Amino acid sequence: MTEAYIVGSYSSSFGKFADRTHKDLTREVYLGVLADAGLANGNDIGMAWFGNCGMWTDGQGSIRGQVCLTPLVREGLFPERVPVINVEGGCATASIALHGAWKDVLSGQTDLSIAIGVEKTFNPAAPERTMELFDGGIDQYDRDEWLSYYAEAGEAAGKPFAPGPGRTIFMDTYAMQAAWHMRTYGTTERQIAIACAKNHTASAHNPKAQYRFPLSAEDVLADRPVSWPLTRAMCAPIGDGAAAALVCSGAWLARQPAAVRARAVRIAASTMTAGKYRRLDEPGLSKLAAERAYKAAGLTARDIDLAEVHDATSFCELYQSEMLGFCGIGEGGRLAESGATALGGSIPINLSGGLVSKGHPVGATGLSMIDELMLQLRGEAGARQVSGARTALAENGGGVMGFDEAACSVIILQRD
């Protein structure tokens, strides 16, 4: 079977960049990923996958990748006539792009495919566009369906569904799930805050993170309430950024210099699942995605050295640690409280700072997770390095279908 490798990865810094365009960010990560792969040019690239969610709010509803890459083509930096496939899947967008590049290589379509994710969610001149971007992640054709669904679920969670101004529907749905988890399993606000504080502490060592200051659990709990039990520090911020990865075949890699081959990381598995309107006591779609990924890679959860997961809120990290098999159902809070998910623990999670602290430019997030894991597996993560890391997992979800994400990706990387 053909093997696929990530030969280069790169992420921009995440933050609020009112003076930078989508084209600016695309240029940075494209040139950055070439440099990381040790390539003088992109002439071998045979396919491109471009992920973005929000350019439609600026009027760019289609051909987004072509628009952002054309200046590079004109300058001779990006090869001509390369197919550019535009993808969107909410917060899972960049993971979908990587999945496409991976399939390109496995199918023999090309020996080198690029995945790029770019997003700008900070729009001080028209903040309503940011809310429109997020609203697009939930069914806009049948609002009554999910309004009644959440109203009924809120009763079961002990937290009435009462969306309010100044926040997205996502925060309310995560808060309801957290409230139900607390009522059912005894999870505490402090356990959620411990996971959050861990990530803020980690991001202080990540030069590309949006927030680079440590917080204690007490700081997190004292922050402004968003939707109980969530405080502002527990919720991913608004911001901009981009990330990219180059996926190659084993045959192409074998032709590269030894220094390039030495830094390549194999994609052991890449799985996707779609969400549904589930009950609160049903497992989420990431559990199935993880089970499929472990089977494809011939691994179990015990083989994972570290993970990056989609913590749009800090409760999500506790929940995903359960769905991914790092602990039993209902035990995510206790796992975080034990220190197991911190640097030096048995299963470090979100050492990049996670979405809540590294940042969450929607269409770039999945590839930024991959960039963090590449740094870790190459031994290049500095103060947040996991000693001896060989196998890593990225879980990313996007959009909402009830209490499921609409799309979920689980990717396993291995250093051979």
Regions found by a protein language model. Give the residues of each.
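Condensing-enzyme catalytic core mediating Claisen C-C bond formation in acyl metabolism
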Residues: M1-K23, S148-G164, I194, P225-R292, ...
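Catalytic-loop motifs flanking and including active-site residues across diverse enzymes
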Residues: T26, R64, T93-A97, F170, ...
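Short glycine/threonine-rich loop-to-helix capping motif typified by GTGT followed
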Residues: M55-R64, R278-P283, D311-R334, P361-G363, ...
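ATPase catalytic-site recognition across NTP-hydrolyzing enzymes
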Residues: N199-H200, A204-R212, R224
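Conserved catalytic cysteine-centered active-site region
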Residues: T2-Y5, N52-I116, K120-A126, E132-F161, ...
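Beta-strand segments within the central parallel beta-sheet cores of soluble alpha/beta enzyme folds
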Residues: G42-N52, V82-V87, S113-G117, R190-K198, ...
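Conserved active-site "lid/cap" helical segment
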Residues: M1-G89, G100, T173, Q177-Q191, ...
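Active-site-proximal alpha-helical scaffold in enzymes
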Residues: V87-E119, M171-H205, A245-A251, P361-A381
